[in-house]
Amino acid sequence: MIRAVIFDLDNTLVDFMAMKGKAVDAAVQAMIDAGLNLSPAEARSRIDQIYQEKGIEYQMVFDSLLYDIFNKVDYKILSAGIIAYRRAREAALVPYPHVHLTLMSLLKNGLLLGVVTDAPARAAWLRLCGLGFHHIFHTVVTFDDTGVRKP
């Protein structure tokens, strides 16, 4: 008899890559509006390269971009990017269709629910809370808990 169901978070419960893409695109446009002298395509390409080198959850990506360009961080441009990123990320943080209904159905059937994710603990819990899922899962295991990435 099945007693528990374990889910991944990103790209299973929520379309992480679409959310990330919308957030980065908004940040790029805001940084350009604040004085970053790059085309949107060039800025996005540089940001994608930083993510490839440092990991998709790298929190200092805009700092790194600005330092690479100016040899310092321009806080006006950085702040514009961060605010736009956060606003777009929150707007795009929605579960895939039928996820909420499925989770509720599993809970009603008495199953325990868990999440195993490669995301850092803070990022995972922010996503779960943003989705309203923080009270649904009995166990959440993050990269910070194990120090190991999923296969």
Positions of predicted regions on the chain:
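A short, charged/proline- and glycine-enriched loop
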Residues: 1-2, 110
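N-terminal helical cap/lid subdomain that shapes the substrate entry/recognition surface
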Residues: 2-97, 122
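Ser/Thr-centric signal marking residues that sit
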Residues: 12, 102, 117, 142
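Class I S-adenosyl-L-methionine
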Residues: 25-32, 104-107, 125, 129, ...
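Substrate-recognition "cap/lid" segment bordering the active-site pocket of phosphatases
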Residues: 92-94, 114, 120-151
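Catalytic-core regions built around general acid/base machinery
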Residues: 98-110
